[in-house]
């Protein structure tokens, strides 16, 4: 019989339910978590034995959204879900980042977490629910895991923090921050903000961590009742004698190698030291394992770097703790792009471009929470040559998607509103060199490229990556970390923003015991670094260009009456298609009568505007127009009088005498003056050639309505 065990608790304005023992009983652990009708089913499977020779922790986190959760059938050709979307990949990373550091060092058994969204309330985002589910399932499983963790979303509305705001509330919020941590410490922060102060951001982190304690308590209660026995796993015994022998051979040499400031030269020397040490030790004792020796060497390497930093000595590349690497900033580096920049910080370099398009170029995202249109696209590419390696080149990997989203968050707060700048904007960051913080280099490069493209961003933005080395109560916060300092340190702390405040904050902490005070020091040190970088960037370009690139489409806007929209579109889109082909422009019409004409050639745009004004012009009774015969019938002739309008000249209105045969007087394509006699309720136009000929006044083109044009 199925005997589900359920725990229910209040979490801010939401009710959360944890249920286990009902489904997936062959998995190591499974939990159904629901928050106000948004439900995520999370399973964990762990292998009891590690694969022979396994030298890393193979944790996989999969997050998948099922369209049935929202009562929909997939819109794809096969009518089923396919590869993970960008959003699913980002949430999988959001789950992975806080749980990964909580597995004990040396644990290399394969573990897989699968979170499946099975029901969704459009007001409750499933990401927090999935994070709570992963924490609960891992805690129940008995797998060595130093959790549970809690997770919370924090908004900032009317100068107040809001716990787990609804989707509607998020639209009003100046902050969207996700924080995860254990009972004692914060482990992960991911956020975007509308240029908020350091104190406000830190307050949000602390608020979220305090509020999520109720989640941790509920999971602990569930584990007491339904948790599986803890695995009898012990780390391999430390071989002190072997450690000492390896240290004697390699420590001083590695210490010298880490004084080489050039990354590639340093890596080559470290590799030589490691391979020579391993060869010598195996020659002395063939029973030794090369993987084990490699791990000991890595630990020595880590200790060399960390102890030097804690002792106040210069860093790997000779800098002090708060120094920024040398900067080189250039704009307009690519002649035919709409905007471009090359941003170099030490051995990290990004070639960034900005491309302008029309509303038609915006990306339509069919997401579980509903369809939305994204008019600001940010793509980050990390080719293998950027770190001097060979490798696969193709579709973006999880890391590239995550870094691209972080960089986008950094720039989003300063992007202009669509009503002021009606362009779709795509930024692409090509990482051409990398040695730490390429995502923050992408933020700096994007700000420069957007200004070079003439995009009226509200302020310049820059990003910086901070690091931390901590032993006991002794700690050092590092500015502008290298790749090695990220890898060997205890924290990766990325901050982007303008002179006025923070636009994005991402934090990943590998150890417990990071206090509010340490985070405060890191944020303040990051602010100084950010302002320094902005100062250098402003020397290259200190404001958006006054005009967009000559190669970018210019969008001209006019307004027409809503009842004229059908005339411009035509039957089945025939008129607007013909206009687009005739004028060589792109034309978009909105429901309120706003017409946007995009063209790289100003004359083509003016011609398109003139043609639209002709089509939408009102026909004036009693006025004479030039016309062209389009169709001849027994009872008269149909003529076009400009702007796609057609009227009938009855046989009795062709001449001032009796007409027996229309073709005796008119031929197809013939141009004749006509006078408007009447426009009936159906919009049909009755015309006269006879009366137009009798009158002496010259013919006129249709009068165009007054229009508003904005470039």
UniProtKB/Swiss-Prot annotation:
It comes from Salmonella typhi. The gene is pnp. This is Polyribonucleotide nucleotidyltransferase. Residues 694-711 have a biased composition (Low complexity). HAMAP family: PNPase. One of its GO terms (cellular component) is cytosol. Involved in mRNA degradation. Catalyzes the phosphorolysis of single-stranded polyribonucleotides processively in the 3'- to 5'-direction. Its cofactor is Mg(2+). It is found in: Cytoplasm.
